[in-house]
């Protein structure tokens, strides 16, 4: 084990931002902010940025290459989940209770909370959950 790693220690590291590749950044950023009831995305350089809690940003960019689907999970409150799930249903979005998509049109009640999986316009697998899995 390398010297910089100390088992059991927690280092003061915070997550700041990530970039999600999109076929159409405006479409993906708008989908994301509407579904999660966030402020409208803001342009910053080549990105459209959506602000989350604790100063975290999700930035959408168009890389000009084929998009490889990724998984992004977002921890939300029970009240926020209610709104998100209702917006998914109202929009007629396909959604699942599990990442294998074996339980369509449902949400799960794993780990003492609720969770739902769905896809964004570029095919990324998004998840909204109310209790962390780990």
PLM region spans:
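Hydrophobic pocket/interface hotspot
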Residues: 28, 32, 72, 88
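A short, sequence-level motif marking secondary-structure junctions
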Residues: 62-67, 133-134
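N-terminal beta-strand motif that seeds the catalytic metal site of vicinal oxygen chelate
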Residues: 2-26, 71-72, 132-134
